From Swiss-Prot:
PANTHER family: FRUCTOSE-1-PHOSPHATE PHOSPHATASE, GLYCEROL-1-PHOSPHATE PHOSPHOHYDROLASE 1-RELATED
Pfam families per UniProt: HAD_2
Lineage, broadest ranks: Bacteria, Pseudomonadati, Pseudomonadota, Gammaproteobacteria, Pasteurellales
Disulfide bonding pattern of the chain: none
Coiled-coil ranges from the UniProt annotation: none
Gene Ontology molecular function, alphabetical: beta-phosphoglucomutase activity; sugar-phosphatase activity
SUPFAM superfamilies xrefs: HAD-like
UniProt-listed CDD domains: HAD_BPGM-like
Gene Ontology BP term (one): carbohydrate metabolic process
InterPro entries xrefs: B-phosphoglucomutase_hydrolase, HAD-like_sf, HAD-like_SPP, HAD-SF_hydro_IA, HAD_2, HAD_sf, PGP-like_dom2
Name of the featured protein: Uncharacterized protein HI_0488
Organism of this sequence: Haemophilus influenzae (strain ATCC 51907 / DSM 11121 / KW20 / Rd)
Length: 200
């Protein structure tokens, strides 16, 4: 049993969404497989896990390259993935145990969501799972110029919740996200190992 008291010293808590707070990854995998079939290609959804935390455009490009699909069709692939995501994700996603940490610190510490997902998907999930009130700030892929592993997402979160980045902790499930948190000068709680990693 994790003792949440280890998070007491931090000014602000910043959470990744996909795979950390909400179990969307199997749905994304299903959607990628369906998109590949639609275009007559076999997409390896393992690539999505390998590039966890990356933008959908980056993941699409890597899948297309691996499947020998011409990259000039990336806009068609992205449109198909977007449409399927809007259909599948809100109906099939559920909260992960990490959300108990959010509930535990709600109204005690400022809490931000820093995600590589687009705002529309985040808003749909917030509505479906009725969790929007738990967050003081939300930063999506649409709100930043640079994406994970760049620290911009998490630095923007810290700015919005008015917390010193070095006094924040990031909760992540993917290597790119862990790297982004450490690059932002923040401690990172890796939900896979349940350990805190420090940039210092």
């Amino acid at each position: 049993m994790l003792d949440y008291e280890i998070f007491n010293p931090y000014e602000g808590l910043i959470f990744d969404m996909d795979g950390t707070l909400i179990d969307t990854m199997p749905v994304h995998a299903q959607a990628w497989t369906m998109v590949g079939k639609k275009f007559g290609y076999e997409f390896d959804f393992q690539i999505m896990y390998n590039f966890g935390g990356a933008t959908v455009r980056t993941i699409a490009g890597e899948m297309m390259k691996a499947a020998n699909m011409p990259l000039d069709r990336i806009e068609d692939v992205l449109a198909a993935k977007r449409e399927l995501s809007y259909q599948l994700i809100p109906t099939q996603s559920k909260l992960l145990p990490t959300f108990e940490i959010v509930k535990s610190f709600h109204q005690k510490k400022p809490i931000a969501l820093g995600s590589g997902s687009h705002r529309k998907i985040i808003d749909m999930l917030m509505d479906k799972l009725a969790i929007a009130p738990y967050f003081n700030a939300i930063v999506s892929a649409d709100d930043v110029k640079e994406h994970k592993p760049h620290p911009e997402t998490f630095l923007r979160c810290a700015e919005l919740i008015q917390a010193n980045p070095s006094r924040c902790i990031v909760f992540e499930d993917a290597d790119l996200g862990v790297q982004a948190g450490l690059s932002a000068g923040m401690d990172v709680f890796d939900v896979r190992t349940r350990e805190i990693i420090s940039p210092r």
